[in-house]
UniProtKB/Swiss-Prot annotation:
This is Uncharacterized protein RP507.
Length: 145
């Protein structure tokens, strides 16, 4: 799985350089992805991309808003792949389809397990249906090991 398709999968569910710079993905399956932030810092030694300040991710009829988003990657052979994504600050995801809203204090997504963990004041709302909890673990796919 390529790095770009990995980004596509996480942003699809939870639905990510300086002075409102936009990054557009160029793969055909994630052509709609756009991430804006005030700052992007890429640390090749720590293998981390850090988006900060008014981070907005537009994707697949969804908008994710937060103040910080970290993408941690690793090198396998000669390819760089995403290991996990961390949203350490409050996040909001809005989807116009089905009038969906997601709120949480923080989130983590682990690619190996295909596991999304939402932490702190988690609220999922779809039309008139609301789910509130302090922690929600969601498996995007069942991984057989």
């Amino acid at each position: 799985m390529s790095l770009q398709s990995s980004i596509y999968r996480i942003i699809k569910f939870i639905i990510f350089l300086t002075i409102n710079i936009s990054i557009y993905a160029n793969a055909k399956d994630i052509a709609n992805l756009q991430i804006t932030s005030n700052t992007l810092i890429i640390d090749r030694i720590k293998q981390k991309a850090e988006y900060s300040g008014n981070v907005i991710v537009y994707f697949d009829n969804a908008i994710l808003r937060t103040q910080k988003l970290y993408i941690f990657y690793k090198t396998i052979g000669e390819k760089q792949v995403i290991d996990h994504i961390v949203v350490p600050s409050k996040l909001t995801v809005e989807r116009k389809i089905n009038n969906e809203l997601l709120l949480a204090d923080s989130a983590k997504y682990f690619f190996v397990d295909k596991q999304l963990i939402l932490l702190g004041n988690v609220i999922l709302q779809r039309n008139d249906h609301v789910l509130k909890t302090n922690k929600l673990i969601y498996y995007v796919e069942i991984v057989r090991k």
